Amino acid sequence: MRFLRWIRQIWRKVPNWVLFWKHLAKPGLSDQREKHLLKGPEKTSKDFDTVKLANAQKEDMVSDLDVCPGVLRSVKERSPLHDRESRSSRDSRSLMTVVNSVSTFMFSVLQSGWRLCRWKSSMSTGKVSSHTRTGSALGTPEAEMLREVYLVLWVIRKQLRELARRQERRRRRRMRSHASHTSRHSESVQGLKHDARSPL
């Protein structure tokens, strides 16, 4: 039947979907590779005096902090850690939407398959009582296949939920480490300002 062929096709595609979402859930390895590749030509192009550049940048940073204290906030907002956090939160949101879509798909498959099983059992048995019709509908091979499909979808939903929870835990860990890093950075900036204002 067309319904059974459709269920078999979906069943074959299910592992590919799980692998695809697992690949999306992993942190961006391609960004790290691109950064690693970009570091090479940058190193070869830097032939000027690095000591003078570092001193000039330090003086500019201290003067900018004295003039405009909002620069540190804008730099923090554009930091790569902030970008990674936003990317991981987007990934966790997409995983949760996939979990919801799989749940609704499970419900629709169960409902339509149950209707099909009841219709087939009523067509084969004819006029019988509702209790006997329910028992015969549960014993059909279509009902058995529907149970197997439902179990596979339930396992997929469970795996996707675990992936979403891992992503959320990873995102919270990164936020904590980012907060500690920014606090340490602000302390070092305060020390630089104090050194710049001291007469010694």
Curated annotation (Swiss-Prot):
Q: Which UniProt keywords apply?
A: Cytoplasmic vesicle, Differentiation, Phosphoprotein, Spermatogenesis
The name this protein carries in UniProt is Sperm acrosome developmental regulator
Where is the sequence biased in composition, kind Basic residues?
A: 167-183
The function of this protein is: May play an important role in acrosome formation and nucleus shaping during spermiogenesis.
In the record, biological process GO terms are:
spermatid development
Residue ranges, compositional bias (Basic and acidic residues): 184-200
Where found? Cytoplasmic vesicle, Secretory vesicle, Acrosome
Gene source species: Rattus norvegicus
Instruction: Extract the coiled-coil ranges from the record.
Output: none
Region entry Disordered: which residue ranges? 167-200
Query: What cellular-component terms does GO give this entry?
Result: acrosomal vesicle
Question: Does Isomerase count among this protein's keywords?
Answer: no
Encoding gene, per UniProt annotation: Spacdr
Q: Which residues carry this modification: Phosphoserine?
A: S63
State the InterPro entries in the record: SPACDR
